[in-house]
Regions:
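Histidine-dependent nucleotide/RNA phosphoesterase domain, centered on the 2H-phosphoesterase fold
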Residues: 1-166
């Protein structure tokens, strides 16, 4: 298990351009795989492996997902994903009822606010290194992957092992 949870220590994938996304059940902070954007995260603590992956983005989030999936399956783990399309996101909240978005006007106001925040992220955070926010996420920075068992969505399941961060 530690081989999988600490995999990001030597296989670093960068995610950039944070934006709010939503569907019928929740909203999240989502990211895109890096494709040559300037690295703005602080350097990892040494000693560490050659950090080529997070410098040239040759190893992407999609590679990481594939590799971890393959290792888990090779170990006999049956994986049931909630989403068919790969997604890099942090769920911020779930809708518990339809009260707050019960009218077309309320839904429009919600979407307008999300669009306003996304415009701010794009204009003020994505390429503005002096704004006080870091608009990227190097997977494994600070802590490794979190291996969990049981249904993982909606905060369920439990942690079995957390990998080494950098």
């Amino acid at each position: 298990m530690p081989e999988i949870t600490s995999y990001t220590y030597a296989h670093r994938a960068r995610l950039v351009k944070p934006f709010l996304s939503y569907d019928l059940s929740a909203f999240a902070l989502s990211f895109l795989p890096a494709a040559g954007e300037e690295v703005v995260s602080p350097a990892p603590v040494r000693p560490g492996p050659d950090d080529r992956a997070s410098r040239d983005d040759g190893y992407t989030y999609h590679h990481l997902r594939r590799d971890v999936f393959d290792m888990a399956r090779a170990g006999g783990v049956d994986i049931e994903s909630r989403y068919v399309v790969p997604s890099a996101h942090i769920t911020l909240g779930r809708y518990l009822s339809h009260e707050d978005h019960g009218t077309p006007e309320a839904r429009r106001a919600w979407v307008d606010k999300i669009n306003q925040i996304n415009a701010w992220l794009e204009n003020e955070v994505w390429n503005n290194h002096g704004c006080g926010f870091i608009g990227e996420w190097i997977v494994g920075q600070e802590r490794g992957l979190d291996a969990r068992c049981g249904p993982l969505w909606y905060g369920m399941g439990r942690t079995i092992c957390v990998g080494e961060g950098f």
